[in-house]
Swiss-Prot record:
This is Collagen alpha-1(XXII) chain. It holds the Pfam family VWA. Residues 239-427 form the Laminin G-like domain. SMART domains: TSPN, VWA. GO terms for cellular component: basement membrane; collagen trimer; endoplasmic reticulum lumen; extracellular region; extracellular space. Residues 1405-1414, 1521-1530 have a biased composition (Gly residues). Belongs to the fibril-associated collagens with interrupted helices (FACIT) family. Residues 1-27 form the signal peptide. InterPro entries: Collagen, Collagen_superfamily, ConA-like_dom_sf, TSPN-like_N, VWF_A, vWFA_dom_sf. Glycans are attached at residue 375. Residues 481-520, 526-565, 566-625, 657-708, 714-773, 774-833, 868-922, 925-984, 1047-1095, 1118-1155, 1156-1215, 1249-1308, 1315-1374, 1387-1446, 1495-1550, 1575-1604 form the Collagen-like domain.
Length: 1626
């Protein structure tokens, strides 16, 4: 045991060393998911696109953005629109999330105009990728990419502009729609043209190329260009072709290092195998591999490599973990593709079959694999062999090596001939490859009907070419032929001198593009390239054009610098009311403004909320002085405005002034009914331009203007500041299947840690299930040559590991002769971790785990424990399923204000435009500067009183009222539920019955059922425990002999005897028959997640150990917290490996818990069927000391006797006559197992005899064997409190008891179901203020309350909705006279108003009375179940009944059913989970190794994979063995032979040993003196006694005092109440 513990500690230290060094290096994964871009969309918004199609463009941009990870440090997106000139819609750095960019894309505005693509290309080259516009420095982390979308030919030149963009490092993808010229698109796009040009027929089709464009974008950024011969691919002309990919022959310099060989029939090739071909992955794939690619190679096996297992190509990381590989298994004739998985460690596909077998001959073959997102296809010799599905792959880690041609198990270079090996970044190229480079390949020689380009005239005979099948070119010499017909158009000439502007002719059909002509030579030769000219002077302004069509509303520009304060403009029409704003604090007093001109009469303003006629208010604060105008005629009565902000006034009463100038614009209110329209005033002069307003709603389309003459092209204007995003567009067309989504969170397997020091060897683990064959590990460093070791034990065949990196090349040695087979070397160090095995079959159920810590006893129902400490952050979850398409987000907040644009030149004054429809109200403008103070206006006329307003809306809830008077007492409540049974007063013990006859020998009992074995495991006094939990079923015994004994004759019934003195406590009875398994209880509420458990000990417990532990533990088991996890269930799906947990500190030894209270006994279960006999166990070692024999009555403890020799099992004798118990003798030797007896047949039930006279109390006899369950007897007297027993099996629900006395409140139980609504209870006292509730539904209108007292003046209210015209109000009090105002212009004559009657101020009303009670509230949730009530008063003692007649001994019952595995699992969890940890830790600490023999446990389920171990120290080099062929994985071998028997250890302290079989009954001892013990279970009824005389009934005792119930004891009293009446004692 000590050795095991030492090994466990060493193993833990070793794991800690490995784990603590695990944070050193992060994997650097590279691929499509890790490349980010500065991406600019260049969108044609010319007139040929049209508004409807531009809507599809907006949606296309949004859909394409959805395939990128957008963020400040990820991909940034900008948009530039162009037609006549380019403008920036939004810059690269403006939006930081995908949703913001998509929303902005859907708001892009359409311009219309010409198509100047060249100008747009120059614009993005100079501006869009600059740091000022959000661009980032160009490096390999951020790629500058532009995607151009156009639908027509450019009206300026594009070639030079595109070349400048390419030189600046901008990769351009050109997408043409409809009539866009492919030749022009190719001039614009980057190389290779075929990968950067897309063309679709119309705008409906642009979304179909979205996925293809996204893949090309990744491929072309990750992959360099490779030049290949044209005859490599089908459907192409001869010559060279540029495509994206990796030519591994060039990248590894294979031909330069190994030298090339020529074969006349084919291309040159290289003979591999003499030197390892290895390169750093960062040098080969600096950006990783694309998501889809094609691997193509032309090679042939050599004699030595045909049957090898090797990698033709492999990428490994810095820890030699494979990232991607292609394996050729010569022995099994298979091709295997492996890669790192996104959801699992590795994914792979294996190709086998007759067509794959052909690859392994010694001919030349072309092998191509097309690796796509969800499948892999294998092509051999240009024919598709098979397509297999594959799971999602992860990007490769580029911090490692890439190898060509190495053996799997030792990384030795492989001998084979290699002609070419290339990776194309387009997976389709695997099927486009031809086989013309294979001598025997299917390359048909057929002449292509397409003629070659015509040769130049007067060409002498030269070698020509003809096209053949698969476009293989064959050179031949041809004489010049006769003159042919006129050839196709010649190449385009040099540009001619610029001609005059001609009239625009009709659009001609596009002609074919001519080939580029030779550069012409001028008279002085070709001149040098001139310097770039300066910007030209601005051209003269063109003539004013005719009025154009009304344009679309422009994008909102950024706010310009504030202009000078303009003159006050004419009063505009009233805007729509804005939404009510919050009440602001009163502003500072403004200075007096200059006198303004008299404004026109405004339209009718908005009324406030209608109110009831109020009392005459106190005098309001003086309003601000208005601009005085001349006396006009009396106008209409205006609506009552809110109180104004206090103005600067002289504190004297003045007359009412004229209507003031309009105040500052209020927040928009809800729309009111239209007011009466005032007369139209004279048109005011144009004011200076105000501040830039916010964008208005789109106006109606104006009438088409007269087309204007084409003006001269002006110089490009300065760049405008970007406007805010426009409103979202309508949903676009459904997109095609999207590009693979963003990478999920990192997988569970972390990166391997740094190399730590070599730790001590770990302890041997339990034998796991054999995994799949792994790949070979790296070869260790060669150690010193060791001596040949002795023959080791035969080990299991190791799994095949993955080959490691090749070592440095050695000099080729002289080939030696074949040596003799060496002796078997010592076992080598373990190899590195192989690939993760696939999911194995379900392993056998492991033993139960070690228990959790015990808690002190808590009564039922179990309360949740205190919240554990916060757990450490869990591993990231698996990526979730893609969510449903979200609804378009709301408009994002306005972006930050950009820098002010350069001030433009003042434009010529345009002709006035046609009057547009009134615009929607603009947002509140910035407040203008304060004007000088205005003069006091003249007093206004008294207004007419307003009409009564409408009834106001329901006011806010008042504050909580004072508590009302206590209501009358309610009706009596419904009868309560029956309470628990009351506790009776302790009665006197009854008379002791006669001893029963001994019963027949029973079958072997389970845990805790054999007398004397309950508490003797640790020595000391044996006290009978209560009934234990059902043990694990033993093997069934054979049928026992029938019992002996004859029932006595029934005696006559005697009268009841006098009350006897209390007898001494009887001996324990045998346990009764096993009750049925209780039904599963309702599942408890899930508890809080606990802290990580302490690590368990390494040894496992067998079922036998569990028996013994349960036997020891079950005697003193308080009900604890929830038990340990149950036995393993069916094997689940393979989980994601978790990170290794930190090692917890070793817990201190816990003290033994206090004795628990007994649970209520269960009801007897149904009889079970006989189980099958179990298999014989292994022969155990001889035990040092057996368990004590059947104990007699309690005597003084004797000294342990010496171990006796093994006795021979004697035949079981008949039961002896009962003797008196003797003193406890020394334990006898353990006998062999007796043969199982044959169960007797069930006898008929005997008839009840007449009661006999009471006999004399006899001495306590030996307890009889368990008899059949008798009829329920009368309740006995209360026994003494016994020791706490183990909880019995869960019983079924008992019947409802009678109502008990009111108990103390219990702890909160779980929420019960909602009960029926009870009668209304009496009114309770007022509660405290509760926390604010959630807003309720609007209630019904209440009855009008009485008039309240007048409140104080409120702050100015918000503008109200337009109300109906009110009645004339009372005249206000005389106002303070204002200052003299400047006379205004004459106003329009107003309508005469009517004078209203003055109102009378009412008195203050009395306070209103208390309102009516509200409706009953919604029924509350049912409260928690209360605590158990206090103990009821004891009932009166009943009279002692006469003893019942003893029945005849029954025959043994049939064997009970074995409990179900579910019941066993639950019982073991409940029993072992309570005290096992502290007891087990204590026992293990006390035991010497000799007591820890345990039976072989079953293997547990496979644990999570550990981290990769460090390479072990170099071992001594063994003698070279003959390399064997890698065999397939064999079945697990049989368990090896048992080791030699160890020496006998010293006797240790009593421990948990394996339990022996039940020995034969010992010789009955002498009767002992009566002892004191707990009451036993009822024995078998004795023979019928004579009938005794009837006794006098006793007087009922006085009632006892009311009991008190400690909450911790409630479960105990509940168990008493639920006990059967015939059970004595606790």
């Amino acid at each position: 045991m000590a050795g095991l513990r030492g090994n466990a500690v060493a193993g833990l230290l070793w794991m800690l060393l490995l784990w603590s060094g695990g944070g050193g290096c992060q994997a650097q994964r590279a691929g499509c998911k890790s490349v980010h871009y500065d991406l600019v969309f260049l969108l044609d918004t010319s007139s040929s696109v049209g508004k409807e199609d531009f809507e599809k463009v907006r949606q296309w941009v949004a859909n394409l953005v959805d395939t990128f990870e957008v963020g400040p440090d990820r991909t940034r997106v900008g948009v530039v629109r162009y037609s006549d000139r380019p403008t920036t819609a939004f810059e690269l750095g403006l939006f930081g999330s995908q949703e913001e960019v998509k929303a902005a894309a859907r708001r892009l505005a359409y311009h219309g105009g010409n198509t100047n693509t060249g100008d747009a290309l120059r614009y993005i080259t100079a501006r869009s990728f600059s740091p000022h516009a959000g661009g980032r420095p160009r490096d390999r982390a951020y790629k500058q990419v532009a995607i151009l979308l156009t639908d027509g030919r450019s009206q300026d030149l594009v070639l030079d502009a595109a070349a400048a963009a390419h030189r600046a490092g901008i990769r351009i993808f050109a997408v043409g729609v409809g009539e866009a010229l492919k030749e022009e698109l190719e001039e614009i796009a980057s190389e290779p043209k075929s990968a950067h040009v897309f063309h679709v027929s119309d705008f409906n089709a642009i979304d179909k190329i979205r996925g293809k464009l996204r893949r090309r974008l990744c491929e072309n950024v990750l992959c360099p260009s490779v030049r290949v011969e044209g005859d490599r691919f089908k459907h192409t002309n001869g010559g060279t072709k540029e495509i994206t990919g990796f030519d591994l022959m060039d990248l590894f310099s294979v031909k330069e290092i190994l030298g090339k060989r020529e074969n006349g029939a084919q291309s040159s090739y290289v003979r591999m195998g003499s030197f390892p071909v290895v390169q750093s992955t960062e040098d080969v794939f600096p950006q990783g591999l694309p998501d889809e690619y094609a691997f193509v190679t032309t090679f042939r096996f050599r004699k030595t490599s045909r049957k090898e297992d090797w990698y033709i190509w492999q990428v490994i990381d810095q820890y030699s973990i494979p990232q991607v590989s292609i394996r050729l298994d010569g022995e099994n004739k298979a091709v295997e593709y492996n890669a790192v998985g996104a959801m699992k460690d590795a994914v792979r596909v294996v190709f086998r079959g007759s067509r794959v077998n052909d690859l392994f001959d010694r001919d030349w073959h072309k092998m191509a694999l097309s690796i796509q997102a969800q499948n892999v296809s294998l092509h051999i010799d240009c024919a598709l062999v098979q397509t297999l599905p594959i799971e999602e792959r992860e990007n490769i880690d580029i911090q490692g090596k890439t190898v060509i041609g190495k053996r799997l198990y030792d990384s030795v270079p492989i001998d084979f001939d290699l002609q070419r090996i290339v990776i194309y970044c387009d997976s389709r190229h695997a099927e486009l490859e031809t086989c013309c480079d294979i001598p025997s390949g299917p390359c048909q020689v057929t002449v292509v009907t397409e003629p070659p380009p015509p040769p130049p005239p007067q060409r002498p005979p030269t070698p020509g070419s003809e096209q053949i099948g698969f476009l293989k070119t064959i050179n031949c010499s041809c004489p010049a032929g006769e003159k042919g017909e006129m050839g196709v158009a010649g190449p385009m000439g040099l540009p001619g001198p610029k001609g005059d502007i001609g009239a625009i002719g009709p659009v001609g059909a596009p002609g074919p593009k001519g080939e580029k002509g030779d550069v012409g030579i001028g008279p002085f030769g070709q001149g040098e390239k001139g310097e770039k000219g300066s910007l030209g002077l601005p051209g003269p302004p063109g003539r004013d054009g005719s009025k154009g069509m009304r344009g679309e509303p422009g994008e909102l520009g950024e706010p310009g610098l504030p202009g000078e304060v303009g003159m006050r403009g004419p009063q505009g029409p009233p805007g729509l009311p804005g939404p009510p704003g919050r009440v602001g604090a009163p502003g500072l007093q403004g200075e007096r403004g200059e006198k303004g001109t008299r404004g026109e009469k405004g339209e009718r303003g908005l009324d406030g909320f209608p109110g009831k006629p109020g009392d005459t208010g106190q005098q309001g604060r003086p309003g601000p002085s208005g601009v005085a105008g001349p006396q006009g005629e009396k106008g209409d009565v205006g609506p009552a405005g809110p109180p104004g902000v206090p103005g600067s006034v002289v504190q004297q009463e003045g007359l009412k002034g004229e209507q003031g100038a309009p105040g500052p614009r209020g927040h928009q209110g809800a729309p009111g009914p239209p007011g009466a329209r005032g007369p139209i005033g004279p048109e005011g002069r144009d004011g200076p331009p105000g501040l830039q307003g916010l964008r208005g709603k789109k106006g109606d389309m104006g009438p088409p203007g007269i087309p204007g003459l084409l003006g001269l092209q002006g110089p490009p204007g300065p760049p405008g500041v970007p406007g805010p995003p426009g409103p979202g567009g309508s949903p676009g067309l459904p997109g095609e299947i999207g590009f693979p989504g963003k990478p999920g969170p990192p997988g569970p397997t972390g990166p391997p840690g740094k190399d730590g020091p070599n730790g001590p060897p770990g302890p041997p683990g339990t034998k796991g299930e054999p995994g799949e064959r792994g790949e070979d590990g790296l070869p260790g460093k060669p150690g010193l040559r060791g001596e040949i070791g002795e023959q080791g034990l035969a080990g299991r065949p190791g799994e095949k590991g993955e080959a490691g990196l090749p070592g440095a090349p050695g000099f080729p040695g002289v080939r030696g002769e074949k040596g003799d087979q060496g002796e078997k070397g010592e076992l080598g160090l373990p190899g590195l971790k192989g690939d993760r095995g696939e999911k194995g079959e379900a392993g056998p159920a492991g033993p139960p785990g070690l228990p959790g810590t015990t808690s002190l006893f808590t009564p039922h129902p179990r309360m949740p424990g205190e919240q554990g400490p916060k757990g450490e952050k869990g591993d990231p979850g698996l990526p979730g399923e893609p969510g449903l398409q979200g609804r378009p987000g709301e408009l994002g907040p306005q972006g930050p204000t950009g820098p002010p644009g350069a001030k433009g030149q003042e434009g010529a004054h345009g002709a006035p435009g046609a009057a547009g429809n009134p615009g929607a109200p603009g947002h509140v403008g910035a407040p203008g500067p304060s004007g000088p103070p205005g003069s006091v206006g003249a007093p206004g006329l008294r207004g007419t009183p307003g009409k009564d307003g409408e009834r106001g809306e329901k006011g806010a809830a008042g504050e909580e009222g004072s508590p009302g008077p206590v209501g009358p007492r309610g009706d009596p409540g419904a009868p309560g539920l029956p309470g628990p049974p009351g506790k009776g007063k302790d009665g006197e013990p009854g008379l002791r019955g006669s001893p029963g006859l001994p019963g027949p020998l029973g079958t072997k009992a389970a845990c805790g059922k054999v007398r004397g074995s309950e508490n003797c495991a640790l020595g000391g006094q044996c006290v009978k425990g209560d009934r234990g939990a059902p043990g694990i079923p033993g093997s069934p015994g054979s049928r026992g002999d029938p019992g002996i004994g004859v029932a006595g004759p029934p005696g006559p019934s005697g009268p009841p005897g006098d009350k006897g003195s209390p007898g001494s406590r009887g001996l324990p009875g045998f346990p009764g028959p096993q009750g049925p398994a209780g039904r599963d209880g309702a599942p408890g509420n899930p508890g809080e997640r606990g802290p990580p458990g302490k690590p368990g000990l390494s040894s496992l417990l067998s079922p036998g150990d569990i028996n013994l532990l349960a036997k020891d533990v079950c005697n003193d088991c308080p009900p604890g917290p929830p038990g340990l996890p149950g036995l393993p269930g069916f094997k689940g799906d393979k989980g994601v490996p978790g990170k290794p947990g930190r090692e917890g500190t070793e817990g201190k030894k816990g003290e033994a818990g206090p004795p628990g209270l007994p649970g209520p006994p269960g009801i007897a279960g149904p009889q079970g069927s006989q189980g099958e006999r179990g298999a014989d166990g292994e022969v155990g070692q001889k035990g040092d000391q057996g368990h004590p024999g059947v104990p007699g009555f309690m005597g003084p403890p004797g000294n342990p006797g010496p171990p006796g020799a093994d006795g021979i099992a004697g035949a079981a004798g008949p039961p002896g006559i009962q003797g008196s118990p003797g003193k406890e003798g020394p334990p006898g030797p353990q006998g062999p197992s007796g043969l199982p007896g044959i169960p007797g047949e069930e006898g008929k039930e005997g008839r009840d005899g007449k009661p006999g006279p009471p006999g004399e109390p006899g001495k306590a006899g030996e307890p009889g064997l368990p008899g059949p369950e008798g009829a329920r007897g009368p309740p006995g007297f209360k026994g003494h409190t016994g020791d706490s027993g183990a909880p019995g099996p869960r019983g079924e629900s008992g019947a409802m008891g009678l109502p008990g006395q009111e108990g103390l409140p219990g702890k909160d139980g779980d929420t019960g179901p909602t009960g029926p609504q009870g009668p209304q209870g009496p009114r309770g006292p007022p509660g405290k203020n509760g926390s604010p509730g959630s807003p309720g539904e609007p209630g019904p209108s209440g009855t009008p309350g009485q008039k309240g007292s007048k409140g104080e003046n409120g702050s100015p209210g918000l503008p109200g909705f337009l109300g109906p015209r009110g009645p004339p109000g009372e005249p206000g009090e005389k106002g303070v006279p204002g200052k003299e105002g400047v006379p205004g212009k004459p106003g329009e004559p107003g309508f005469k108003g009517e004078r209203g009657d003055p109102g009378i101020k009412g008195d203050k009303g009395p306070p209103g009375g208390k309102g009516q009670p509200g409706d009953p509230g919604i029924p509350g949730h049912k409260g928690h179940t209360g605590l158990m009530g206090p103990q009821g008063l004891p009932g009166e003692n009943g009279p002692v009944g006469p003893p019942g007649p003893p029945g005849q001994p029954g025959f043994p019952g049939l064997r009970g059913e074995s409990p179900s595995m579910e019941t066993l699992r639950r019982l073991i969890q409940e029993e072992l989970g309570k005290q096992l940890e502290t007891r087990l830790a204590y026992l293990l600490a006390q035991m010497p190794p000799a007591y820890m023999k345990s039976s072989q446990g079953r293997p547990g389920p496979p644990g999570p994979p550990g981290k990769d171990g460090l390479p072990g120290r170099a071992g001594p080099m063994g003698e070279p063995g003959r390399p064997g062929q890698g065999g397939l994985e064999g079945p697990s071998g049989p368990i090896g032979p048992k080791g030699e028997r160890g020496a006998k250890g010293d006797p240790g302290a009593p421990g948990v040993g394996l339990r022996g079989e039940m020995g034969p009954p010992g010789i009955p001892g002498q009767p002992g003196e009566p002892g004191y013990a707990k009451d036993g279970l009822p024995g078998i009824p004795g023979p019928q006694g004579e009938t005794g005389p009837a006794g006098h009934p006793g007087l009922p005792g006085p009632p006892g005092p009311p009991g008190q119930c400690d909450p911790s004891q409630c479960a105990y009293f509940a168990s008493l109440a639920a006990r059967p009446g015939n059970v004595k004692g606790p």
